[in-house]
From Swiss-Prot:
InterPro entries noted in UniProt: ComplexI_51kDa_subunit (IPR050837), NADH-UbQ_OxRdtase_51kDa_CS (IPR001949), NADH-UbQ_OxRdtase_suF (IPR011537), Nuo51_FMN-bd (IPR011538), Nuo51_FMN-bd_sf (IPR037225), Nuop51_4Fe4S-bd (IPR019575), Nuop51_4Fe4S-bd_sf (IPR037207), SLBB_dom (IPR054765)
Family label: Belongs to the complex I 51 kDa subunit family.
Assembly and interaction partners: NDH-1 is composed of at least 14 different subunits, Nqo1 to Nqo14. The complex has a L-shaped structure, with the hydrophobic arm (subunits Nqo7, Nqo8, Nqo10 to Nqo14) embedded in the inner membrane and the hydrophilic peripheral arm (subunits Nqo1 to Nqo6, Nqo9) protruding into the bacterial cytoplasm. The hydrophilic domain contains all the redox centers.
Keyword 4Fe-4S annotated: yes
Protein name as annotated: NADH-quinone oxidoreductase chain 1
Positions with a binding annotation for NAD(+): G54, R55, G56, G57, A58, G59, F60, P61, T62, G63
Keyword Cell membrane: yes
Superkingdom: Bacteria
Catalytic activity: a quinone + NADH + 5 H(+)(in) = a quinol + NAD(+) + 4 H(+)(out)
Organism placement in taxonomy: Bacteria, Pseudomonadati, Pseudomonadota, Alphaproteobacteria, Rhodobacterales
Residues reported in the UniProt entry to bind [4Fe-4S] cluster: C346, C349, C352, C392
Enzyme Commission number(s): 7.1.1.-
GO CC term (a single one): plasma membrane
Binding positions (FMN): 167-214
Length: 431
């Protein structure tokens, strides 16, 4: 279990003062100018050594991502864009940072922008996050008044401006290039790659898009050192991380823990255990709605990190899990997710535009048991045709929960079809 002195987000639950004065008391904005004066290369090398991987779901090494930005300007400005469009069902970790500990994000944005040669950064915040936007804007205004942003930001000699942009509630804008399109005032639709954002991103200029948590942990890593951060977790899965627990746990929460914590320990220590005890566990979606669902047996010894989730044929994602007990109709739960992805498809790619709707309709029939057993395999085959055949990962996100359901809960689907045929279809369980 993570010790309190090792926590980065010390006001995660809003028990303290979120203002600039409160943030300084908790150690933020301490020696920021000295960190910047180390130079771009040393900061990026330190981030690489820390082993920090993107906290938005993809898990790409953060230091390496920063190193893709041009070392010398060709006349175009560079930009940092922070993805605060946290829209995936069950994922609610970044909003706690913005609502209660916004200065971790603002200080991180200054340091990260300097490391990439960017004099401006944009925070693209989800349309529904009204209170979070107010808290973040108030914190930004405080920093401008205190000289921590603007000309000679924090006395570092680096000029830096930070802008907050409110989205309009589209899940697809969480994809980095769709986010850039939306930020430019266009319809949020993913771009073809290459060119990658580091070559031609916002307004055709070099751009890096990072998740809120990825940026917010930067100042603490650089203060305490890469070795400190890398000491948590295991190789390739280093550091501390925000985990979310929702669903049928006794105490749903967002909690900061070390990477590579066993799933069962996370649920029992921080989630207060499964409602009705561990034996009442039926399934877990481990990292947000797009991850393949796991059975109770798989969860018993599963490790919550990138490699651990890959070992059980799922995904670490955002590490915000949905816990389902025996009262859950898991087939209907996955249908609900397929409905979400169908609704949020931008329609640009045919496999996603047509496939998400088709998968949702077949799932709806499977929920009712109004299908043939052979259709289960056909549905699985179609998910494989959608997966990997779209510009962005929304097609994959729609396919994976269904694939996990068929792999791990096929008997439940078949039983429902047989029960419908024999007239034994009972009352449906809770979702």
């Amino acid at each position: 279990m993570l010790n309190d002195q090792d926590r980065i987000f010390t006001n995660l639950y809003g028990m303290g003062d979120r203002s600039l004065a409160g943030a300084k008391k908790r150690g933020h904005w301490d020696g920021t100018a000295a960190i910047i004066q180390r130079g771009r290369d040393k900061i990026i090398d330190e981030m690489k050594a820390s082993g920090l991987r993107g906290r938005g779901g993809a898990g790409f090494p953060t230091g390496m991502k920063w190193s893709f930005m041009p070392k010398e300007s060709d006349g175009r400005p560079s930009y940092l864009v922070i993805n605060a469009d946290e829209s995936e069902p069950a994922t609610c970790k970044d909003r706690e940072i913005m609502r209660h500990d916004p200065h971790t994000l603002i200080e991180g944005a200054l340091i990260a922008s300097f490391a990439m040669g960017a004099h401006a950064a944009y925070i693209y915040i989800r349309g529904e996050f009204i209170r979070e936007r107010e808290a973040l804007q108030a914190a930004i205004d405080e920093c401008y008044d205190a000289g921590l942003l603007g000309r000679n930001a924090a006395g570092s000699g680096w000029d830096f401006d930070l802008y907050l942009h409110h989205g309009a509630g589209a899940y697809i804008c969480g994809e980095e290039t769709a986010l850039l399109e939306s930020l430019e005032g266009k319809k949020g639709m993913p771009r073809m790659k290459p060119p990658f954002p580091a070559g031609a991103g916002l307004y055709g200029c070099p751009t890096t898009v990072n998740n809120v948590e990825s940026i917010a942990v930067v100042p603490t890593i650089l203060r305490r050192g890469a070795e400190w951060f890398a000491s948590f977790g295991r190789p390739n899965n280093a550091g501390v991380k925000l985990f979310g627990l929702t669903g049928h746990v006794n105490t749903p929460c967002v909690v900061e823990e070390a990477m590579s914590i066993p799933m069962r320990e996370l649920i029992e220590k921080h989630g207060g255990g499964i409602r009705g005890g561990w034996k009442n566990l039926k399934a877990v979606i481990p990292g947000g709605a797009s991850c393949p669902v796991l059975t109770a047996e798989q969860c018993e010894n599963a490790i919550m990190d990138y490699d651990g989730m890959r070992d059980v044929r799922s995904s670490f994602g955002t590490a915000c899990m949905i816990v389902m007990d025996q009262s859950t109709d898991v087939v209907k739960a996955i249908w609900r997710l397929s409905k979400f992805f169908k609704h949020e498809s931008c329609g640009q790619c045919t496999p996603c535009r047509e496939g998400t709707g088709w998968m949702m309709r077949v799932m709806e029939r499977l929920v009712r048991g109004d299908a043939e057993v052979e259709e289960i395999d056909m549905l699985f085959d179609v998910t494989k045709q959608v997966e990997g055949h779209t510009i962005c990962a929304l097609g994959d996100a729609a396919a994976w929960p269904i694939q996990g359901l068929i792999r791990n809960f096929r008997e439940e689907i078949e039983d429902r079809i047989k029960a419908k045929r024999t007239g034994r279809m009972g009352a449906m369980a809770a979702e």
